[in-house]
Amino acid sequence: MKLIASVLNPVHNFDARSTAMLSLLTFKNCFLSNGRVLIFQLKPCRKLQTTRFVLAESVASNNDILFNATASMRKNKDAAKLMTDRIHYVSPAKRKQTRTPSTGHQNRKRTTLKWNTGSERAQAAANFTLRQVFKMNERGVVKVVNQTTNKLEETSILIWAGELDLQKHGLAIVDVEQRGTFSIPLVKLVESKTALKKYSDELAKQKEEELTRLGFSSKRTGRKNENDSNEDNLKQIKVSWQISDADLNKQKANEIISQLKKGYKVFLYMNGKDALNKSNWAEDITDEEPAHTRKHSDRELERRQHIVEQLQVIVNEFSLSPTVEGSIETRLIMKLSPKPVASKKEDRMALKEQRKRERQEKLERKLEKKKLRNSENY
């Protein structure tokens, strides 16, 4: 590096290149002498180059402006960084306040036990009873019989049932005492089989109530009411008014007779084909007949009467006198009860011959009626 001193005339023309070169100078010192400005510069060059005239005051002012601007920018940058750090930093005390609020599961009381004895079904039955208790009162308070003193005492169901052996015993609520707004159930130990049976009945009852709430009737759920038959040996068979003679005398006759032979009661539901194919066909059969019904031709009514008479002939040998409800104009129910079985072989043979004769006589009467109708038409 060479130290070069250049004396510049204050009245001097400079081009753009000289002005650009001036910006590369590093000013170390300057002073006034006879109205002229002396500028010392450090420049890595071998010869003197023309430099534009610059006042010392302007250079110093520019340097101050650049220095102040740089300092201000650095200060603003540090302040922005500090604010960012403050935003992202959360004190431990505030972290506790910003945690997700509790959903209540941590404070939910236990309403079941983890059993070590008994089958899964027995454990489910016991926990079902526990949930019933907690529905009556939140604390799970029950009345039980003290095995030592044989006296009633109040305790917690979880404590009392904790040591229960489900292979031998189960829980059952036998009574409920009302106290203000809550109830205290009386719980007793029962045999494991009894507890399982009670549990199954409760589940069936809940399922039935759910189906009823969804709009399903007792007929569709299989529930028996006061108007239904109290016996379980009842079979329901549908017979369409449009059935052919071949199907009636073969497939349908075999289906009816086989059930009567087994000792079942049989209800024959006769209605139109479309009505019997509905999902609620049993309700349509038992509901009251509508006031306005479609009229059928005489030929259609004769066909329906023929089906009823033919069914009576088919079941005569195996059924007692059938009970008929309804009308051939709309729908009809034929209720059949099986005949008692003869105890001796001779009685069975005689009964069979008698039924055969009765069937033959009915068939002859039917043919006579048919001939009579044909003669009247001619």
From Swiss-Prot:
It is found in: Mitochondrion. The keyword Glycosyltransferase does not apply. Residues 343-367 have a biased composition (Basic and acidic residues). Residues 1-18 form a transit peptide. Keywords: Mitochondrion, Transit peptide. It comes from the Eukaryota. The keyword Transit peptide applies. Residues 339-378 are annotated as: Disordered. GO terms for cellular component: mitochondrion. Belongs to the AIM23 family. This is Altered inheritance of mitochondria protein 23, mitochondrial. The lineage of its organism: Eukaryota, Fungi, Dikarya, Ascomycota, Saccharomycotina.
